[in-house]
Amino acid sequence: MNLNSIPAFDDNYIWVLNDEAGRCLIVDPGDAEPVLNAITANNWQPEAIFLTHHHHDHVGGVKELVEKFPQIVVYGPQETQDKGTTQVVKDGETAFVLGHEFSVIATPGHTLGHICYFSKPYLFCGDTLFSGGCGRLFEGTASQMYQSLKKLSALPDDTLVCCAHEYTLSNMKFALSILPHDLSINDYYRKVKELRAKNQITLPVILKNERQINVFLRTEDIDLINVINEETLLQQPEERFAWLRSKKDRF
């Protein structure tokens, strides 16, 4: 299996998995044009689309792709049923694509119906988990997003986190504002800064590394707790997550 990233809009990535035969899976195609260009250039045969949630920058290209390739099966949560989904999937179910089983994981927070897809080592997490950050809470609660991130953080160490946006640099600037002396965060920030200066992608990331540099996955970390306690005493990791998310929203 080959993993490919297709840039779209200002900072989106549309992920494509293809096998040796050229069959491919497309994840969150917000725009059809760059996907069609890649299909032509690589002689891919699209088999399926995975949708993580209903926002336009993730579903906007579905109609055109299905018109061009009517054999495509479109998997998605209930909230994407009017966006072209032909196979609604929910937490605990599996999608069998390209000879692989993808587990569906419910991750409410960014939207109420948001889902992720996992088939080792690939995690397609839409707008739930970003490198160094997490999605904004447009529909769900901080508690829901905290629980969703806990699910994803519990996946195997070698999981490849395939996020849908290039937000890594801004996320790491925020992380440095919270933990300015953290060695892992500083090292990763320098690496990301160099990549973005060359207009290179920072994704996917390995989950084991992500746990070290993403403050939203470190709500039980003593260094982070001490920083938060300087401003307010919060006993529960969910409360600390909500504090971080609110802080990031104003960053």
Swiss-Prot record:
<feature type="binding site">
    <location>
        <position position="53"/>
    </location>
    <ligand>
        <name>Zn(2+) 1</name>
    </ligand>
</feature>
<dbReference type="InterPro" id="IPR035680">
    <property type="entry name" value="Clx_II_MBL"/>
</dbReference>
<dbReference type="GO" id="GO:0004416">
    <property type="term" value="F:hydroxyacylglutathione hydrolase activity"/>
</dbReference>
<protein>
    <recommendedName>
        <fullName>Hydroxyacylglutathione hydrolase</fullName>
        <ecNumber>3.1.2.6</ecNumber>
    </recommendedName>
</protein>
<comment type="function">
    <text>Thiolesterase that catalyzes the hydrolysis of S-D-lactoyl-glutathione to form glutathione and D-lactic acid.</text>
</comment>
<feature type="binding site">
    <location>
        <position position="110"/>
    </location>
    <ligand>
        <name>Zn(2+) 1</name>
    </ligand>
</feature>
<dbReference type="InterPro" id="IPR050110">
    <property type="entry name" value="Glyoxalase_II_hydrolase"/>
</dbReference>
<dbReference type="GO" id="GO:0019243">
    <property type="term" value="P:methylglyoxal catabolic process to D-lactate via S-lactoyl-glutathione"/>
</dbReference>
<feature type="binding site">
    <location>
        <position position="127"/>
    </location>
    <ligand>
        <name>Zn(2+) 2</name>
    </ligand>
</feature>
<comment type="similarity">
    <text>Belongs to the metallo-beta-lactamase superfamily. Glyoxalase II family.</text>
</comment>
<feature type="binding site">
    <location>
        <position position="57"/>
    </location>
    <ligand>
        <name>Zn(2+) 2</name>
    </ligand>
</feature>
<dbReference type="InterPro" id="IPR001279">
    <property type="entry name" value="Metallo-B-lactamas"/>
</dbReference>
<feature type="binding site">
    <location>
        <position position="127"/>
    </location>
    <ligand>
        <name>Zn(2+) 1</name>
    </ligand>
</feature>
<comment type="subunit">
    <text>Monomer.</text>
</comment>
<keyword id="KW-0378">Hydrolase</keyword>
<feature type="binding site">
    <location>
        <position position="165"/>
    </location>
    <ligand>
        <name>Zn(2+) 2</name>
    </ligand>
</feature>
<keyword id="KW-0862">Zinc</keyword>
<dbReference type="Pfam" id="PF16123">
    <property type="entry name" value="HAGH_C"/>
</dbReference>
<feature type="binding site">
    <location>
        <position position="55"/>
    </location>
    <ligand>
        <name>Zn(2+) 1</name>
    </ligand>
</feature>
<dbReference type="InterPro" id="IPR036866">
    <property type="entry name" value="RibonucZ/Hydroxyglut_hydro"/>
</dbReference>
<feature type="binding site">
    <location>
        <position position="58"/>
    </location>
    <ligand>
        <name>Zn(2+) 2</name>
    </ligand>
</feature>
<dbReference type="InterPro" id="IPR017782">
    <property type="entry name" value="Hydroxyacylglutathione_Hdrlase"/>
</dbReference>
<dbReference type="Pfam" id="PF00753">
    <property type="entry name" value="Lactamase_B"/>
</dbReference>
<keyword id="KW-0479">Metal-binding</keyword>
<comment type="pathway">
    <text>Secondary metabolite metabolism; methylglyoxal degradation; (R)-lactate from methylglyoxal: step 2/2.</text>
</comment>
<dbReference type="InterPro" id="IPR032282">
    <property type="entry name" value="HAGH_C"/>
</dbReference>
<dbReference type="GO" id="GO:0046872">
    <property type="term" value="F:metal ion binding"/>
</dbReference>
